[in-house]
Regions:
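Short, acidic (Asp/Glu-rich) active-site segment that either coordinates a divalent metal cofactor
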Residues: 78-81, 88-92
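A generic structural-conservation signal
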Residues: 19-21, 70, 132
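Beta-rich nucleic-acid/ligand-interaction surfaces
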Residues: 139-141
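Conserved phosphate/anionic-ligand binding catalytic regions in large, soluble enzymes, centered on
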Residues: 81, 145-146
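Short glycine-biased active-site loop of nucleotidyltransferases that positions the nucleotide triphosphate
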Residues: 34-37, 79-84
């Protein structure tokens, strides 16, 4: 099954043309993770910048029976962000805001695309400590860390 032009049009309506990649050369970097051992081109790659956009993408995908694979920076080594054929890669790196730091309750509310380093630095600036220290912390994202249990 080829990825449909109709789905691409609907995704562009949700996100804007600049946030939907469909050209083969643009899809290749999203066809593997940090291992590069497993590869599969997705149907398209989309960049969401809000929870509302994520919701609209997932609603469309569900109605159209299109698989979705979420992705941060793609530094994982387990194949977790490798797409399946004709899927939507939902890249969350542009959702990179720290929304709240609650020092009293030792919590931080962040978007999925915030880097591990930014979380660590924000905690440190508040006199707190964020213990996970992956080697990829400059580029790995919190969403990816959680999704991959890293």
């Amino acid at each position: 099954m080829a990825f449909s032009d109709s789905a691409v049009s609907k995704l562009r309506a949700i996100l804007g043309t600049e946030n939907v990649l469909t050209a083969r050369e643009d899809l290749i970097p999203y066809s593997f993770d940090g291992t590069a051992a497993i590869r599969q081109l997705p149907g398209c790659v989309v960049f969401a910048t809000s929870a509302e956009q994520v919701s609209a993408i997932l609603k469309l995908a569900n109605e159209s029976k299109i698989p979705v694979v979420t992705r941060g920076s793609g530094t994982g080594l387990s194949g977790g962000s490798v797409p399946v054929e004709d899927s939507i890669v939902l890249c969350l790196v542009r959702m990179d805001k720290i929304l709240e730091l609650d020092r009293a309750n030792l919590t931080m509310l962040v978007e999925a695309g915030v880097t591990t380093l930014k979380v660590s630095e924000t905690a440190e600036a508040a006199g707190l400590f964020y213990p996970p220290d992956p080697g990829s912390m400059k580029i790995s994202t919190i969403g990816g860390n959680i999704a991959e249990n890293s």
